[in-house]
Amino acid sequence: MYESSPWKEDLKRRRQLLLQYNTKEHFEKDEDKAYTVIEKAIFYSAFIIRKLLDCNGKMSDEADQYAIKVTEWKPTRKITVMHRWPREGKFDWEEGKTKNVLGNKVCNWLIHSFVFLTEVNEDGTIGSFFVSSDYDKNKVAYQVEISEWEKYMKFIETDWVVSLHSHYDEKKQDYVFTKKERG
C-alpha cells in the first residue's frame, strides 16, 4: 500500500453507511437493502483495517494494540454447512464470557468467517454480530457490538503516524519498526 489516505477515506465512508442504514426507518423502508449495506460495511471495513495494519509503518502502535470487547459463546452442537446459524440450541446462551481481543483478530475472524449472523434490536436495528472463523467454528462464536465495531473503525480512520522509529535487522534482512507514534 503506497498511501493510506484513500483506504482510510473508504473506511470512513463504510462507517458512515453503517450508521446511516442502521436505523429503524431504513429497515422499515427496505430491510434487505439496509442489511446488505451494513453487512458489506462490516466485511469491507475488516479487509481495509487488516490491510492497513499489515502494511508496516502505516498505523500507530495504538492501532496495532487496539482492543475490542467481545463475548464468547460455546457451541452445543457441531457447526456444519447445514447447521451454522447461531440459533437457540446451537450455542450455550447461558455461559457467555466477555473479554478484550485485538481488533486485528476480529478482522481475521470476519475475513475467514464460517459463521456470521446479526442480532436485531427490538426496534429492528442491528445491535451486534456473531462471527466464527472456519478454524474456530466448533470452538466458539464471538459476539461484537455494532457500537464497538464502529468505534474501532473511527479509531483506525483517524490514526496517523507522526513519528516512526526503525532499525535494520540483519536476521530478518529488513527494517523493523520499534515505535510508531499516533498524532
PLM region spans:
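Acidic, Ser/Thr/Gly/Pro-rich intrinsically disordered interaction regions
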Residues: 1-43, 47, 54-183
